[in-house]
Amino acid sequence: WAEPEAIRKKGCRDCHRFSLNEKQLNKGPDLFYAGDKLRKNWLNEFLTSPTVIREVIYALDSDFLIGRPKSNQPHVALTKEEAERVSNFLLTLRLPDLEVEKVDEEPLSKGERAQAKMLFERNFGCISCHRTLNLVGKVRGGVSGPSLINSGLRLKPDWVFHWLKTPKRFMSKGRMPVFDLDEETAIRITKYIFGIRTNP
């Protein structure tokens, strides 16, 4: 797919990188692996009716690092036609050697989910940076990272698995910790994240 004109007209490159070789901007998420990461239906909907995923400005912003985070500005909205062309283009952007089919979409059992919740909240402290839901559906957690509520509609499971295992592969500088996760633990946390949704 050729790069759509809307990417230039809407100033997408002011906030996003479309290639690993471009300078890291720290304003919005990188898009050079969007095809590995994002689901098409969600992407089309987001581009036409943007919602807030990260409540504060990108975590490498200097104001964030000294304790004065700024709220994110609303994302620009595209027409349906623009969104379709842009999403088709973005989904062609992939890393050449990212292993797929690491995670199936079979949900965790009740017992496995309880164990994964302990890993997510206590062992690895993911809740310190990410919005999630408690047992009665109330929002809780930090805001320095993107919200994980309903993230299964947005993200592909294999990408989440690889992000948990090797975040530096996607972002050389950032606040995401590098954990020494075995595959089973990474899969379990990925599935737990995909179960954080407002309509179980």
PLM feature spans:
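Sequence context of c-type cytochrome heme-c attachment sites
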Residues: 1-5, 17, 26-30, 60-77
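Sequence/structural segment immediately N-terminal to covalent heme-attachment motifs in c-type
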Residues: 1-19, 107-134
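Gly/Gly-Pro-rich "capping" loops immediately C-terminal to redox-active cysteine motifs
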Residues: 13, 17-46, 60-62, 131-162
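Sec-exported extracytoplasmic/periplasmic mature domains
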Residues: 17-20, 36, 48-52, 91-95, ...
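General marker for long, soluble alpha-helical cores
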Residues: 37, 97-100, 104-106, 147
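C-terminal capping alpha-helices of c-type cytochrome domains
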Residues: 68-101, 177-200
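Structured core of small recognition/catalytic domains
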Residues: 134-135, 140-200
